[in-house]
Curated annotation (Swiss-Prot):
The lineage of its organism: Eukaryota, Metazoa, Ecdysozoa, Arthropoda, Chelicerata. One of its GO terms (molecular function) is toxin activity. This is U3-lycotoxin-Ls1e. It comes from Lycosa singoriensis (Wolf spider). Keywords: Disulfide bond, Knottin, Secreted, Signal, Toxin. The keyword Manganese does not apply.
Length: 115
């Protein structure tokens, strides 16, 4: 009976130790993957396409405005057969940015009143 109990405790200890090492390996792999994704995103952010420039080569490369990312919009010019794609800001997002800017300015004025 003592042998079975000792064997059970020993196997449980070894199992928990191996599980902990496996979890550490998984955590390290997740951390490395996250760092590589962040580096790729930073590199991609440096190569963004400015507003009203051609984005037909990569439709997800448009730059961000203050709050929102611009959208690659494609259209056919009048009398033309070739599709033209440019980075543009949708009107509803433009209005939302203007409203947020005005709210920020108004909030600054209120803070000055109470200072």
């Amino acid at each position: 009976m003592k042998f079975v109990l000792l064997f059970g405790v020993l196997s449980l200890t070894l199992f928990s130790y191996s599980s902990a090492e496996m979890l550490d390996d998984f955590d390290q792999a997740d951390e490395d993957e996250l760092l590589s994704l962040i580096e790729k995103e930073e590199a991609r952010a440096k190569e963004c396409t400015p507003r009203f420039y051609d984005c037909s080569h990569d439709r997800h490369s448009c730059c961000r405005s203050e709050l929102f990312k611009d959208v690659c919009t494609c259209f056919y010019p009048e009398g033309g057969d070739n599709e033209v794609c440019t980075c543009q800001q949708p009107k509803h997002l433009k209005y939302m940015e203007k409203a947020a800017d005005k709210a920020k300015k108004f909030g600054g004025k209120i803070m000055k009143w109470f200072s």
